[in-house]
A protein has these predicted regions:
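Non-catalytic, conserved peripheral segments adjacent to functional cores
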Residues: 1-75, 88-93, 98-149
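Recognition helices and adjacent regulatory flanks at domain boundaries
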Residues: 83-85
Length: 149
């Protein structure tokens, strides 16, 4: 239930990004003690928003949830601490907003490869059309960082 999950979250930072069709961001997370929960939404355009459970011992560890967020459906997605997050841009451009309950801490930054075959995520973007930052192209597979979680 959305109210139960978000009611006690104290958001401390708001962010906004602008991207164009084909951009894939992620899959990013922060390790404790700087782990972050996020509340994300689209102001303009459309994305496929993805969260991957990285909580060791969770019955859904390594599984993902993918939800379309758009300016038309007005959906938001809450990503709890312990999940990696990413999105793909499905419209010509997107303005994406997210609230975080902890500040960005580069020393605790972690990531999983967007195209990790073990995660089997359908980003709804053809692989040859996916646009990634140099940084996002170099992330390891989940199985290669298990000891760091």
């Amino acid at each position: 239930d959305f109210k139960r999950e978000v009611a006690d979250v104290d958001f401390v930072q708001d962010n906004e990004s602008k991207s164009s069709y084909g951009v894939v961001r992620g899959l990013h997370f922060q390790r404790p003690p700087y782990a972050q929960a996020k509340l994300v939404r689209v102001v303009k355009g459309k994305v496929l928003d993805v969260a991957v459970d990285l909580r060791k011992g969770s019955p859904t560890f390594g599984h993902h949830v993918a939800v379309e967020l758009s300016e038309d459906n007005h959906r938001q997605m809450f990503i709890p601490r312990g999940f990696a997050h990413g999105f793909s841009v499905l419209s010509d451009e997107v303005i994406f907003q997210y609230k975080c309950d902890n500040f960005y801490a580069p020393q605790s930054e972690g990531a999983v490869a967007w195209d990790d075959p073990d995660l089997d995520i359908d980003w709804r973007i053809p692989a040859d059309k996916a646009l990634l930052s140099d940084k996002d192209m170099k992330h390891p597979r989940l199985k290669d960082i298990l000891g760091e979680l």
